[in-house]
Every structure is written in structure tokens, then in C-alpha cells.
């Protein structure tokens, strides 16, 4: 039996995802004009052309419904191609033309994509807009999602061990409440990722042995950069060990968790999940506010492609424990005509090898890599 290479599997996975996406477009209940736009746009050759087509034609739509549908569709396409920051902007644009829970859902999708792009300030602004709408508008699963996203952002912003400990306690509390049941694997994984607590790992692997999170803990699968890379805090070590003992331990010099080698299998697992039941906590109180101003005017569609997006200096394609695995990836990149660099990263526990592909003036190297079947993580 002949087995597919990692690259072939990634290409096949992307093709299957794209086929499903286009099938969804064909049968979805979009307006006729949006369906026509979708079929014309997605028939183009590559990401750059599709991106330019939608940016040009969406402003020409006349009705709010058409603009909402087209922006949502475009956002889904951008997300499929891991252009998460651009997807966040388009989801938030779609929210301008929606009401009630539909508007909230677009804003939550925007927040999730902003976190995946490490655009944390934009994620906070978008989540603050959800708060401004009012908790009474949110349905149960949206409320639970809102609270979890708030904690993830607070974990990212934690500057002391005490602040980190406060958010970890909140995650532990959520894990005891029914409304967060479907979040339990990612909540446990978050706690394990930061603290390396073996009791948390045991609970995760015993309760959910076939979950991606449990399989990742035991090393059976590894985490692709587009999934948990940004959503999970990376500070640990002495600062975490000091939690609860000191109010002044600063995390800015804390070690960074070494990131496992990348495999494509984990890419489809998203941190955004739904929950049913009743939320046990109220919306954020004033003492837990996001510390950002509420956007009153919304967001407009940029005139330029990618306007407002920070251009990455390049892309990490792998973070390997074994140098020979990094070499195989570099050989494949060379055959496909990509430039690359190998960086040696020394951690307290081991040496890791980072394969890095620099961006060029076009700004589309990342999408060329995606089209070639590679998983990437932008570095700014």
C-alpha cells in the first residue's frame, strides 16, 4: 500500500475543504445576485484574484441583505485560507447589516478570527461591541462563547502571576457549570498548556481520550499553528509556579512554550464551539471590563486590499524537535521554489529547529504557501 506524504495529505485536505465550501455556496439560500457573485469569484484562479474580485464588487451591491451575505461569504473564504485578520474585518463589516443574535454571531466570529491572527486589540474591541449590544440579546451559547473569549483575551493580557491565576480559576469554575460542557476539552487544555498540571492532563485524557486536546497532551497528534497557537497563552515556568505566592511576579520575561511539530490533522479543530443550557455568570461587570472604548460607528470596508492589515515579515512552517524533519521540509520547499531559513531555538529542555519563509513585496507569499498545501504561522 502506498501512503500519502504529509504534503500530499495537506493538499488533499485543503481540496476537500474547498470543495465542501463551494458546494455550500451553490446550495445556500443566498440572494440571486450574491450567488452569481460567488460563482464568478470562486471560478478565478487563485486567492489574489478572488480577494480582489470580492473587494471590488461587494461595495457595488445595493441592499443591506446582499452586502451582509456577500461579506459573510467572503469572510468564510478568507478564513478557509487562514487570512484570519482580514476575515475578522469582513465578519465585523457583515455585523453592520445584521440585527439581534445574527449580529452578535458575526461579532463573535470576528473575535475568534482576530484572536487566531493574534490581533488581540481588535479582538478586544470587537468583544466590547458585543458587550455594548447587551447580554439580553445573546442566546445561551453565544453568552458562553462570549465569556470564554473574554477569559482567553485576559490570559493573553495577564502581566503578573496573580492575574494569570485569577483567569485560570475562572476557567476552572466554568468547567463545573453545565453551560460550558462542550467547552470542557479546550478549557482543560488551556489550563494544562499554561501550568503543565498532570492532574489536569489526567482528567482530560481520561474523560475525553479521543479528543484532539487529549491526543495532543499524550503526543499522538500535534497542534497546527492556525488553531491553538494564539488562543493559548504561552507563558509558564517560574512565574506560573509562583502563582498565588506573589502579586508582583512579571511574566514579560517568562519562557515561551516550545511549540510541537506541525501536522495537518489538527487544523480543522477550531477553538470556537457552541454550548447549550443557561449561563451561570452574568456579563462582564465594570471591574472586568476590557479596557477599550466601544466602537460606536462600526467598521467600513477598506478601499485597498488588505488595508489596515499588518504585513508579516514571514511565515513559520514548522517547529521541529528533530533536525532531519526540518531538513525534509526544506528540501520540499526548495523543490517548489520557495526561499527559506533555518533558525535554531534553544529552550531549557531542548533545542528546536524553526523553518521560516520570508515574505516578499507582493504580500502574498503566505497564500502561495497555502495553495501549495503548507500550514503556516505568520510572524510579525
Curated annotation (Swiss-Prot):
Organism: Treponema pallidum (strain Nichols)
UniProt superkingdom: Bacteria
Keyword field: Signal
Stated name of the protein: Uncharacterized protein TP_0752
PROSITE patterns: SPOR
Signal peptide: 1-28
Residue intervals of the SPOR domain: 307-380
GO molecular function ontology, one term from the record: peptidoglycan binding
